[in-house]
């Protein structure tokens, strides 16, 4: 699928789209994190209602950051391992030419990237062996063993192929679910952009997007617009003649040379959930 950049001036997340997708439905009030209080409008039938004015304002901030990050030559790592997010994250990351993790986050994916890169090199070797006819010269038992190894590496590292170094940012579906990924990013000062539900700790996120991180329509809406930000940034880089390394979509995947984030941590900037999931 060819990525098409949004038109300049398009508002990233219209209020009507947020309502239709159920982005405003938080968790049960008894499951909330009090740090999310500034982003909560109220409660209805035991469910916290997220303040969508905050969502639109903070998403615009995140959108501008991501556009600038990619426009300067960086790449974004999309992370979403929960079942309802996996296909959406993979599809949108590929559309934007970005990297992704949709199965289990392997410890050290960022903090021990040298080991991860060894796995990526091994995956590339096995793919080459399969394509160039090497398998045909091996015993069937050996081919079966190598294929199992290749399939396992593809499952956990396939979305990182071509990634030569740290991303300029990570985009996360559910900080509570992806706590290890966020911990690694924070250790390395990699900015975190995240759909942050009412049970999450916003202090761990640089660019909070208050919203429902369980409903499929909510995840799809926000993830698609994050991908749009990346597409817009890539187009901006192309227009300015700053080259262009491709990511998971297939390309050189050189190391991101810059970290465009300036400033400290803290992206706050100043029943119905399951019904919305279909």
Swiss-Prot record:
Which keywords belong to this entry? Ribonucleoprotein, Ribosomal protein
Per the record, the domain of life is Bacteria
Skewed-composition ranges (Gly residues): 243-252, 263-272
InterPro entries reported in the protein's UniProt record: Ribosomal_uS2, Ribosomal_uS2_bac/mit/plastid, Ribosomal_uS2_CS, Ribosomal_uS2_flav_dom_sf
Task: Give GO terms for biological process.
Answer: translation
| GO CC entries | cytosolic small ribosomal subunit
Entry-linked Pfam families: Ribosomal_S2 (PF00318)
The UniProt annotation puts the region (Disordered) at 235-278
Q: Does the keyword Methyltransferase apply?
A: no
* GO molecular function ontology, one term from the record: structural constituent of ribosome
Report the record's disulfide bonds.
Answer: none
Similarity comment: Belongs to the universal ribosomal protein uS2 family.
- Know the name of this protein? Small ribosomal subunit protein uS2
Species this protein is from:
Sorangium cellulosum (strain So ce56) (Polyangium cellulosum (strain So ce56))
**Gene name per UniProt:** rpsB
């Amino acid at each position: 699928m060819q990525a098409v950049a949004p038109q300049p001036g398009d508002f990233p997340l219209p209020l009507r789209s947020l309502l239709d997708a159920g982005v405003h439905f938080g968790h049960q009030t008894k499951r909330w994190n009090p740090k999310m209080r500034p982003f909560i409008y109220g409660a209805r039938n035991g469910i916290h209602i997220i303040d969508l004015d905050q969502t639109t304002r903070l998403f615009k901030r995140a959108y501008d950051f991501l556009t600038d990050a990619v426009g300067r030559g960086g790449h974004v790592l999309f992370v979403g391992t929960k079942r309802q997010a996996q296909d959406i994250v993979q599809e949108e990351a590929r559309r934007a030419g970005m990297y992704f993790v949709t199965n289990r986050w392997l410890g050290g994916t960022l903090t021990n990237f040298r080991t991860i890169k060894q796995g990526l090199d091994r995956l590339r070797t096995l793919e080459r062996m399969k394509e160039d006819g090497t398998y045909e010269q091996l015993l069937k038992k050996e081919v079966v063993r190598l294929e199992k190894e290749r399939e396992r590496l593809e499952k956990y590292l396939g979305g990182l192929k071509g990634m030569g170094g740290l991303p300029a940012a990570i985009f996360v579906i559910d900080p509570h679910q992806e706590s290890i990924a966020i911990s690694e990013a924070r250790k390395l000062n990699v900015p975190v952009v995240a759909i942050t539900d009412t049970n999450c700790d916003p202090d761990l996120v640089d660019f909070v997007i208050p919203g429902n991180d369980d409903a499929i329509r909510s995840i799809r809406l926000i993830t698609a617009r994050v991908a749009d930000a990346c597409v817009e940034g890539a187009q901006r880089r192309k227009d300015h003649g700053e080259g262009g390394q491709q990511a998971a979509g297939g390309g050189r995947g050189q190391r991101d040379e810059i970290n465009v984030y300036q400033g400290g941590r803290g992206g706050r900037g100043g029943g119905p959930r399951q019904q919305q999931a279909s």
